[in-house]
C-alpha cells in the first residue's frame, strides 16, 4: 500500500498530465509516442536505484515477507510508471516485468494457501495484456514516425 500511495499514485497523476499535454497532432484520442535518450535512460536508472534502495529499507522496516522479490517489484513498478510518464512504449515491458515478479510472489503465497492461485492467473493475464500493449505501442510509434516528415 505504501508503494502505491507514495510512488505509483503520484506518478500516475504526472503521467496523465503528460499524456494530456502531448496529444498526437492535436488529436486528444492518441498520445504522441516519445523516444527517450541515452542520457535520460542513465538518469532513469539512477532514480530507479535510489527508489529501490529507499523502498528496500521501508519494506524491511515493516518486516515484509519475501523482501527481495518485493523490492524487485518496487523497482519494476517504478520503471513502469516512469516510462509511462515519459510516453515510451517500453512502459508496457516494465509492467510486464512487474507482472512476472508478482506472479512469483503470488505463487509463493499460493504454496501456503491454494486460494491465491486465482491471483496468479490474474497476473498471467496482465502479463499477456502488457505484451500486447508493447506490440501496439511499437506499431503506433512506427505509424507516427512514418507520418511525421522530420521524425528521426
Residue ranges and their predicted role:
Residues 1, 50-54, 100-108:
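Hydrophobic alpha-helical transmembrane segments and adjacent interfacial helices
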Residues 1-2, 57-66, 108-118:
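Helix-coil boundary and interhelical linker segments in multi-pass alpha-helical membrane proteins
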Residues 2, 41-45, 93, 120:
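Hydrophobic alpha-helical transmembrane segments
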Residues 3-11, 70-76, 96-99, 118-127:
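Hydrophobic core segments of alpha-helical transmembrane domains in multi-pass membrane proteins
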Residues 6-25, 138:
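Membrane-water interface of transmembrane alpha-helices
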Residues 13-16, 78, 131:
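Hydrophobic residues within the alpha-helical transmembrane core of Major Facilitator Superfamily
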Residues 18-76:
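Membrane-proximal helix-loop-helix units in multi-pass membrane proteins
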Residues 84-152:
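C-terminal transmembrane-bundle signature of multipass membrane proteins
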